[in-house]
Amino acid sequence: MTDFDTKKLNKKWTIEDSISTYGIDKWGEKYFSINSEGNISISPDNKSQKKIDLFKLVKEFKSREINTPLIIRFNDILKDRIAELNNAFSQAIETYDYKNIYKGVFPIKCNQQRNVLEKIIEYGDRWNFGLEVGSKSELLIGLSILENQKSLLICNGYKDKKYIETAILARKLGKHPIIVIEQRDEVKRIIEAVKDLKATPILGIRSKLSSKSSGRWSKSVGDNSKFGLSIPEIMLTIKELKEANLINEMMLLHFHVGSQISDISVIKDALQEASQIFVELSKLGAPMKYIDVGGGLGIDFDGTKMSSNTSTNYSLQNYANDVIATVKDSCEVNNIQHPIIISESGRAIISHCSVLIFNILGTSHVSSQVKVSDQKKQSLIITNLIETLNQIKNLRDKKEDLSEIIELWNDAKKFKEDCLVAFRLGFICLEERAYAEELTWACAKEIANQLENNEIIHPDLSEITDTLASTYYANLSVFKSIPDTWAINQVFPIIPIHRHLEEPFCKGHFADLTCDSDGKLNNFIDNGKIKSLLNLHPPEKNNDYLIGIFMAGAYQEALGNFHNLFGNTNVIHIDINEDNSYKIKNIIKENSKSEILELLDYSSDNLVESIRVNTESAINNKTLTIQEARKLIDQIETSLRKSSYLSE
């Protein structure tokens, strides 16, 4: 019997069981589902019949020597997300008879990859979709790839004089940059730049709202927020712009109430406050034309549609309706022309289109099999543990309440602690300690088997599940590919991409390749709650066990680092054809070890030469043969050209 044989597969396991276990029917929306073969299926929208089998896709990539870990970017999903956002605002504008338009922008910081931004511009062109930049580097990207002169380029972030001058001069190229004043000292720089260049900008102002936010980033807004002007600072800025004859260039109000806002009431409150500020700025003589509602449009990571860190209590259409209706009401009450609505919705656009796939390298787990000790005379601790295990087994066919099981489990834990103390003092040997641990695990497994049908586990017994959990070793760096799970405990949908016709009877979590205890994935979505273990299958010999992390297209690639020198993974951009085939549009190859070392100023040639010199010394000292030296150098040179991740 193998370590995973403690429970036989349930032959009646169905796809519906897998759907219920992983909740993919909730968080998967129209994009992700399980097909009749038990594999994850990708659909770009609900209007066409296009579908692609994710597991088969990854296997085909492997045949092309494009190995895991890898990111697959589905261009069709990105296209659909952009259309969904723009259509939602179009519908709201029609419903509320709004007398202006919506012009969205994508915040480059969410995903700066060139292939991503080019697709966003391509797919958004029909709506004059623009970009938002937050640094001089991002400004250069925006100016170089945004060709549509009707598209907006919102200029946020800290701005020195060069940033401001670049944005002002870009207007002469036919671009449409709007410089958003976020710090008081930017006003002086803008005035100086206008005088020096004898050119005028389009200006906006970012307000710090008093409205409270919700979710993980709720503390990033308000009086102590990093960006924006207080109301007194806004009044002073308006005064200075009037004195500099620049008030006629002030056309935009911007605000931001945090990312991934979970509660729609927060958005409504912020909109009401901001709309009134917009009205007042108009009354002060600024020809206000735009209101930028910032980011914050959340996505539903767990599918519960509730206000939480992993969900939202509103839909995309709810959001658009509230933005349009609130701004309209404030303007009409004050006889102000309806402004152009701008939003900076990054996460909602880019998250769904990227799927991160990794393979499992191996597992470790607690064995419930007890090996008979060779010790002729057993210590009292061992005897007590054997007796406890037998007492637990004797409860199998009895209907006592849980109190007896709890008592016996506490006894087993106490005997194990006694064993550790005895070992420290030298009273028992290493073999006896190993035997005691095996007996304790066997007690835990026996209790787990007896309680497997209990829907609610007593708190005193809940630790047993963690005790018996398996660790699945992932060919992945958490710090490189999915850093938000480590940095802010963000929870993403994680699910095997195949074998959904089999029962995932193992409970486990993931450990990554890095030599860091934080390199793990142990928070998983569970119907609105977070659980520490995921239902998984036992890996099969000679077959990859493939896991997908979904809805992780925002921020992760930009925030990832080279911890332990694990580099970028392969990234493949694909289009799904009408016949359910696919076309690879772009392949961004993973970093080789040589490329990673070069980033840290290590020359691969120098590295090889240094080792070669060492081999010469070893040959002279007769500790290494010439053949061994050649083999070592060959392996090092080959390794430098290969991936930093593990391969077969």
Swiss-Prot record:
Residue positions binding substrate:
I291, D292, V293, G294, G295, G296, L297, G298, I299, D300, F301
Q: Which SUPFAM superfamilies match?
A: Alanine racemase C-terminal domain-like, PLP-binding barrel
- EC no.? 4.1.1.19
Required cofactor(s)? Mg(2+); pyridoxal 5'-phosphate
Pfam short name (any one) = Arg_decarbox_C
At the top level of its lineage, which domain of life is listed? Bacteria
Residues annotated with N6-(pyridoxal phosphate)lysine modification? K109
The chemistry this enzyme catalyses reads:
L-arginine + H(+) = agmatine + CO2
Q: Which UniProt keywords apply?
A: Decarboxylase, Lyase, Magnesium, Metal-binding, Polyamine biosynthesis, Pyridoxal phosphate, Spermidine biosynthesis
* BP term (GO), one: spermidine biosynthetic process
GO MF terms listed in the record are: arginine decarboxylase activity; metal ion binding
Q: Transmembrane residues, as ranges?
A: none
What does the similarity note say? Belongs to the Orn/Lys/Arg decarboxylase class-II family. SpeA subfamily.
Q: Which NCBIfam families match?
A: PRK05354.1, speA
Q: What job does the chain carry out?
A: Catalyzes the biosynthesis of agmatine from arginine.
Q: What is this protein called?
A: Biosynthetic arginine decarboxylase
